[in-house]
Design a protein with these regions (language model features):
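Basic, helix-initiating cap at the start of DNA-binding domains
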Residues: 1-28
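Residues in the recognition helix of alpha-helical DNA-binding motifs
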Residues: 20, 52, 62
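Helix-turn-helix
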Residues: 24-58
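Short, basic, alpha-helical segments at the C-terminal edge of helix-turn-helix-like DNA-binding modules
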Residues: 34-35, 63-72
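Hydrophobic alpha-helical connector segments
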Residues: 75-104
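Amphipathic alpha-helical packing segments from all-alpha helical-bundle domains
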Residues: 89, 112-137, 145-156, 183, ...
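C-terminal peripheral helix-coil segments that are non-catalytic and often amphipathic
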Residues: 134, 153, 161-195
Length: 195
């Protein structure tokens, strides 16, 4: 049985609110944005906002939860096999997801974003990648931790830069670059470990 479809008007309203939130978060922290400010910016009635969300914090939590759910689904769809260098499909999916949600991802990962959101993404990636590698190479844990931290920080910087770019490279190009950087870094930092 398929899930019931959401009314187009609801989807449109949520998209307007989400876009408005992303635009306002380019200027200020979500905690400093009022419902009145958001609905005026998004050109949506205040009462309509309250049909969907209780406040800005709940809206932000809802948007983040949806994105985290999709990130986790992508990671689960492409399990990491430490003996096969097959992370490219996962990296491709993650860049496609971010491209599809560019404005809100740029806001969440930008200077006025939510550090907790980034930490949750890191936890998902760690749970599904670092742990698999650590289980496969228990005697290399220190090397893996260093390599993973290096790659993760580099990827976060690369993603932030890409999301803020005026003329960003296509997601497929970014996925290829990122994969190459991860693969080369892990090979250099952890000889004998495939990433």
């Amino acid at each position: 049985m398929t899930a019931p479809k959401t009314d187009r008007r609801i989807l449109r309203t949520r998209a307007l609110l989400r876009q408005g939130l992303a635009e306002l978060m380019q200027e200020k922290n979500a905690g400093d944005i009022t419902v009145n400010e958001l609905v005026a910016h998004a050109n949506v009635n205040r009462s309509t906002f309250y049909l969907h969300y209780t406040d800005i914090d709940q809206m932000l939590a809802s948007v983040e939860a949806e994105l985290l759910e999709r990130i986790e689904a992508s990671v689960q769809a492409h399990p990491i096999d430490p003996h096969q260098a097959q992370i490219f499909p996962l990296v491709g999916d993650l860049f496609a997801l971010m491209a599809e949600n560019r404005e809100i991802c740029a806001a969440l990962l930008g200077p006025h974003g939510d550090m907790a959101f980034l930490l949750q993404i890191e936890a998902i990636l760690s749970r599904y990648s670092l742990q698999v590698l650590a289980d496969a190479y228990p005697d290399r844990r220190a090397d893996l931790d260093s390599g993973y931290s290096f790659c993760l920080s580099g990827c976060v910087g690369l993603i932030k830069n890409w999301l803020q770019a005026e003329e960003p490279a296509p997601p497929e190009v970014m996925a290829q670059r990122t994969y190459r950087l991860i693969h080369n870094a892990m090979r250099g930092l952890c000889p004998g470990v495939e990433a």
